[in-house]
Amino acid sequence: EETGVKNIIFHPKFLPSIVILDPVLTVGLPPKMTAATGMDALAHNLEAYCAPGFHPMADGIALEGMRLINKWLLEAVNNGSNIEARMNMITAASMGSTAFQKGLGAIHSLSHPVNAVNNIHHGLSNAIFMPYVLTFNKDVIEDKIIKICDYLELKDRSFDGFINWVLDLRKKLNMPHKLSEVIEEKDFQLDRLSKMALEDPSTGGNPKKLTEADMKIMYQHSMSGTLF
């Protein structure tokens, strides 16, 4: 809160000996928070899969994580007492955090600064930034996105079909389309946020090499609601 910076702290000794995923503990999570954390899990799996580099295990985990989210997120939001839906969502979330050892990308780079400076929920900001970052990266991720469409068995198995799936999912979850719906223009520090986004640890995992100008234009598109 004092610095306005979201830091990542990690050490091998932080790793637990065992992890128990108990869906019963998530039953009381309100629908809005279930939606936001579910979109966060989607962002983890999606960016891990699109990150450059060779990591077939992470790719496989990420694909299956996205399939589970596609099947179970809306049910978990609309019927929070459905233990099967909760179990599959907590599993998908765990899979995403396993897969992103491969890398993340600009969705997270843009999110972390607004989380720290503007106090916007991380999953909510990831959901907002997702289609803008995807369309910005289109020329280098289109083949991977089509593979995701095939695995999820989407009706329209194209890049635009995937974008429409993301937009439709957000709409069904009652999530905002534009960053300006959650941050007022007067509170939006474009230069500061863009610099922070470029310096974010997630930036190195983006499929395209990014500049501060790239961060600015992605923020601007996210504020206006204009896809690339």
Regions found by a protein language model. Name each.
Residues 1-102, 213:
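Carboxylate- and glycine-rich phosphate/diphosphate-binding segment that chelates Mg2+/Mn2+
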Residues 29-31, 53-58, 131-133, 160-162, ...:
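A ubiquitous short alpha-helical element
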Residues 41-48, 60, 64-75, 88-91, ...:
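Alpha-helical scaffold segments in soluble metabolic enzymes
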Residues 49-55, 103-104, 136-143, 226-228:
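Short helix-capping/linker segments at secondary-structure and domain boundaries
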Residues 104-161:
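C-terminal catalytic subdomain
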Residues 145, 149, 153-228:
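C-terminal charged capping/lid subdomain of soluble metabolic enzymes
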